[in-house]
């Protein structure tokens, strides 16, 4: 089951890598287009990062299953994964699903930014929004059986708690880097807003 996630995660990571740099930022972008581009880059980067973690987590889980050791008998493969490889299984599920949703959202955002025909742009964008919502609905319906969580938000919270429980310098350093990334993201939003306001003020004066 881990390998069934690892393969599509690897394929999606390859696509997301190209998508991250698919909408370069330019100086002449207005506030709306500039913000859409920045959100698109962020969503594509989140998709790539999440799929990379899913690949590593599933690979580690597969390698652990190959270790010669005695294990209790489980009624199903899912119970085996939840019992013996809880961290790897939760990490694989959450990052794969989160990356998939981020990728669908990024495509929807890109459609309204680069397609010149307004009606077609809205049609394509809404198509991918519908796909993202449908995928989220499918996940919420079956995720309790797979992980014991009610929805993907609960799955993410469980994943975060497991990361804290794992401990270790590298895990804490990773969390610190995520906090720093959020800080700089806030600075990007603030800078874009102030620059655009200044440009509008100059144009109107």
How would you name each of these model-derived features?
Residues 1-29, 44, 49-68:
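Cytosol/matrix-facing amphipathic helices and coiled-coil assembly/linker segments
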Residues 34-204:
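Alpha-helical transmembrane segments of integral membrane proteins
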